[in-house]
Amino acid sequence: GLPKLPDNQYKMPDDLLAVCTVLHEEAGEGTVRVVFEPDFNLIVRQYDASFELVLDRDMVLTYQGSNTVSTDALTEQEIEDETKILQIITQMDLSLDQKEFYRSLREMNAEYIVLSSSSAAVSYVETAGCIPVREVEGHIIFRVEEK
């Protein structure tokens, strides 16, 4: 069966808990590699360590303007791919070629993307070839197909 999820002692947002539950239902057992929006990305592993974050925590913080962290642990290719993914999911620049975006997802071995339903990136991600799997608590979970 699925692992029993820990009690919500971290006071995680209910919508994040619901998303985590659905991701486990979809993915089955084992670790799941997920692209989360920055706010979820920074907290999800405190609640559930079976998620592998596609976006490195320090990369997200650097992207958001922090200069107290370092991305030295990442390769140039990882930084490039993660930057492309971030610029889409944060709706900063939706002009990136969708094939490029998809290639970066595949490079980073992303299995799922979770976006806020109201995000301007939703239609971009869908057009790029990600499959919307479920909508839950104001978020859409997309599966990244192996092409």
What are the residue ranges of the model-derived segments?
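Extracytoplasmic
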Residues: 1-147
